[in-house]
Amino acid sequence: MPEPRAVASLLVAFVDLTRFAAQSQRVDDVELADTIDAYYEHVGAAVQAAGGRIVKFIGDGVLIVFEADQVDRGVEALLGLKESIDRLMTQRGWECRLVAKAHFGTAIAGLFGVVGDKHHDVIGKAVNTTVALDGSGVTLSVAAFRKLGPVLRRRFKKHTPPVSYIRIEDPRRFR
């Protein structure tokens, strides 16, 4: 039976790797495929362990969602991924680092695609807002930050303009 589309309140996250395109040019396709597969496996395991869902892989980008009652677990997973993926890439000799962005909002969740080949996806402004967040480490929108519990909030600081929250360890980016 087809999965119905529904409005869902979600923590929407997008992760990708800095310098991935440049690094992929210096290796052969076999190493590239092995590296991206190891990255996918690592991200997938961490997201599933935290109760989240991989919506899709897009090259080195990954669209991830967590249900509204899993915001802290989702953000903790992103923080853990930042450290573990950076370590994985360093061990492989790749000069890539993980960037993670998260926003809390509503999106339409359900099956999308061509007839006979529909896949679960999330569509809406919350997804666009997530991807548009500016940051170099782990960045949260105000809406995502406000959903965090008090202990996890202490791991972030305000970064303006526009207002977003970044890990204490991440440098500020000035334009």
Whereabouts are the PLM-identified features?
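A general secondary-structure junction signal
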Residues: 58, 100-106, 142-146
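Intrinsically disordered, glycine/charged-rich C-terminal tails and inter-domain linkers
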Residues: 1, 9, 136-175
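Alpha-helix/helix-capping structural signal
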Residues: 18, 106-107, 128, 143
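Catalytic NTP-binding/metal-coordinating core of nucleotidyl cyclase/transferase enzymes
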Residues: 2-73
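A short glycine-enriched loop-to-beta-strand structural element that forms part of the catalytic core
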Residues: 11, 94-111
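Catalytic-core segments of nucleotide cyclases and related cyclic-nucleotide turnover enzymes
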Residues: 109-134
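Catalytic/regulatory signature loops of cyclic-dinucleotide turnover enzymes
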Residues: 89, 125-146
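Short helix/loop segment flanking the catalytic signature motif in cyclic-nucleotide metabolism enzymes
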Residues: 28-31, 56-97, 102, 122
